Amino acid sequence: MTISPQRTIIEALHTKASIDPAEEIRFRIDFLKDYLLYAHAKGFVLGISGGQDSSLAGRLCQLAVEELRAQAGKDDYLFIALRLPYGVQHDEEDAQLALQFIQPDRSYTINIKPAVDGAVEAFEQGTGLTMSDYNKGNQKAQERMTVHYRFAHHFNLLVVGTDHAAEAITGFFTKYGDGGVDISPLTGLTKQQGRELLRHLGAPERIYTKPPTADLLDKRPGQLDEDELGLSYEVIDSYLSGQEISSEAAQKLERRYHITEHKRHLPVTPFDTWWKEQ
């Protein structure tokens, strides 16, 4: 029996047509707790942008460490939230709203602009080339992850990712940037299901109704994810939930999934075959 590309992708990304928000929250908090204990780490660190995904992941992490502290009877575990703006963030109020919702144990702000600009300048001086705005956007994402790991190493923490199914299918993340993490608690959720979890957790409506943006490009500040993808999250979620969408949209999604497969794997070795099976 031939399995359709849609069914293959749904199974690979562990998506479900519907969820029970309370059960999903419990499942993901328990996952965070169990893996933290397995890794012998002391907590989690995550950058908070003010958007839906980092707000949800951050709140789940905070709840997980609070439960672990209660179970252990001591303050051995913590969650650190990072603000990592490139200069001045135009929607800083949203980031502060997210922090109020998450209530992290600690939060720090580090401006990544000097480090990013220094890396761009060194590249351009050393090569005589001009770094593209897109390449610089990836540099921002990778610098943020570098900062995450400085905190992780200092405090013995796990770096948390915010990748969910709608980003996974499109490869909409920077390799070794926001994709370079230790643990990914939102895996398998569609964008709409993430909103359901935030509503259940009592998040301010602004957090989950705000149009998503990676906001990495200098020349297109605040560019919406959906504009860059050329597909709405509603269409992507429908596909991931097993619903029928237009053949054009399905083909576009399946093509993006295949050409970004390398992003969903560790570095390829001579013994890997997944890349030959596309």
PLM region descriptions:
Residues 102, 122-126, 176, 201, ...:
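Alpha-helix boundary/capping residues
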Residues 59, 93, 97, 146, ...:
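Residues on a specific face of well-ordered alpha-helices
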Residues 1-46, 52, 56-60, 220-278:
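Peripheral terminal appendages
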